Structure formats: C-alpha cells, structure tokens
Design a protein with these regions (language model features):
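N-terminal glycine-rich phosphate-binding loop and ensuing alpha1 helix
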Residues: 1-60
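Residues at the starts of beta-strands that form the adenosine-phosphate
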Residues: 2, 48-50, 74, 107, ...
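Conserved beta-loop-beta/alpha segment of the NTase-like Rossmann-fold superfamily
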Residues: 59-63, 67-156
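A residue-level structural signature of the nucleotidyltransferase/glycosyltransferase Rossmann-like core
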Residues: 51, 108, 116, 180-181, ...
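Structural beta-sheet core signal
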Residues: 5, 52, 110, 136-137, ...
Length: 248
C-alpha cells in the first residue's frame, strides 16, 4: 500500500502563519503537524512509501522535512509546479498527478497534512481489510450547520455501506461527517483518471468518493476519538494551547 498525502494547498485562511510556511509544517507542541500523522502511518506495516504532493512554493520545505525524517516509510516529495490558487491542480488532480508520476499500481491511503487526530489508522486499515472495499472515515457531529458547511455528509446502511455522500451540502441529511482520509483498492486507483476525464470537480478530495459510491460499494469507518481540521488560526491556537497543557 502507498500513502498519498495532499499538501499542495496555500492555506490562505491561516495567514499570516502560512504566508511563508507550509501548513503541514507549522509547529504543534514542538513538532510539525505532519509528524503526528506519520506516527500513525508507521504502525501500518504494509505502507512502504508515502508520496507527498506539494505546490512549487513549499516544495523545498517538504523536501527538507523529508530529508530529516527518521522513520521506516520511504518518502517521495513531488512538485506539482503550481504557484497559486489560480493555477492549482486541485486535491483530486494532485491525486492523479501522484499516481502518474510514481506509476502507482497499488492500494492507496489518501490523507492531508493538516488534521490532528487521536484515533488509530491501524484500526481503520483493519476495517478496510474486513470489508474488502473502498473506505471513507468519519464520525457523528452535534452541530449540524457546521457539519453541512465544512464536511462531506454521509448516510449509511446497517452494514456501514454508504447510501449517500455529498461534499458540503449546505443542509445535512445525517449527522455523519467524513474527514479527508480515504482508502482505495488497486482497481479504484485506475478510476481517478476516469473521474477527471468526465469533467468532475478537481477540488475537495471528498468529491471522488461522492462519485464513486454510485458505481462501487464504499464503506464508512466510524472512528472513536478526536480529529481537528486545522483550517483557521483560531483552531490552530486552541489546539496548540490544549496540547501544551497536556504536555506540562
């Protein structure tokens, strides 16, 4: 299995913190945010390589981080050659870029670098093995308005199979929100190109499984734990304070 980490965003909502530093490399309780995700990835033995897709602006920063990485997993950093939001490839465009550049012919786990979470990726991987099908990951929300405007909203059947999945619908049809961590089978990796060729949205990684479940079974792993989407300075500061207090 390969991990593909989408790190090519410009994180303008986090300015001024991210004007000159990639969001995934911002310090969180003394470590880059991305380190916490790699701690979890390292526990999945079958992941032998992580492909990071960066924009041109922050490419060298991720190369420098990768050169200092001490873990087991091989890290490949790609420059998607984009320089602003105006010419970006989009999250799903970057997925295909990684697949093409690295000739990926394997199962993939797709992640982002700006989520801090406490749940186990091993448990998620084991769920994927159990259902033997494409998977998304999510949890239940109390704030339905926040859910509907910030996440893909899913409904599932009694077997946890997706029955509907809509990216940021505006009005939530359930209380289940999906985070940007996906596992796709080897056969599904080949469908990313088909999705893009049909002219579907290149942005927001949740748009791909929203299309996919119409053709193939997609299952939802409901995690126990916390996940923070570090999308604003407010969330970043609150999480920094929380972790600093835990470490003291």
């Amino acid at each position: 299995m390969k991990a593909i980490m989408l790190v090519a965003g410009y994180a303008t909502r986090l300015y001024p913190l991210t004007e000159n530093k990639a969001k995934g490399l911002l310090p969180l309780a003394g470590r880059p945010i991305i380190d916490y995700t790699f701690d979890k990835l390292e526990k999945i033995d079958c992941i032998d390589e992580a492909i990071l897709v960066s924009n041109h602006k922050f490419y060298e920063q991720f190369v420098q981080w990768a050169n200092g990485y001490k873990g087991r997993i091989k890290i490949t950093v790609l420059d998607d050659k984009t320089t602003s939001n105006d010419n970006r490839l989009g999250a799903i465009g970057d997925m295909q870029y990684a697949i093409d550049q690295c000739n990926v012919d394997d199962e993939i786990m797709v992640l982002v670098s700006d989520n801090y979470f406490t749940y186990s990726l091993v448990d998620y991987y084991n769920f994927y093995r159990k259902v033997n099908a494409d998977c998304v990951l999510g949890c239940e929300f109390d704030d339905m308005d926040y859910l509907a405007h910030n996440f893909a909203v899913a409904t599932i059947d009694q077997d946890s199979k997706i029955t509907s999945l809509v990216e940021k619908p505006g009005v939530a049809t359930s209380n289940i929100g999906v985070y940007a961590t996906y596992i796709y089978t080897k056969d599904t990796v080949k469908l990313v190109k088909k999705y893009l060729a049909e002219g579907n949205s290149k942005d927001a990684p949740g748009n791909f499984p929203s299309w996919l479940y119409h053709f193939k079974p997609v299952y939802l792993y409901k995690f126990a734990g916390e996940c923070y989407d570090i999308g604003t300075v407010k969330v970043y500061n609150e999480l920094t304070d929380k972790l600093s207090k835990q470490n003291n």
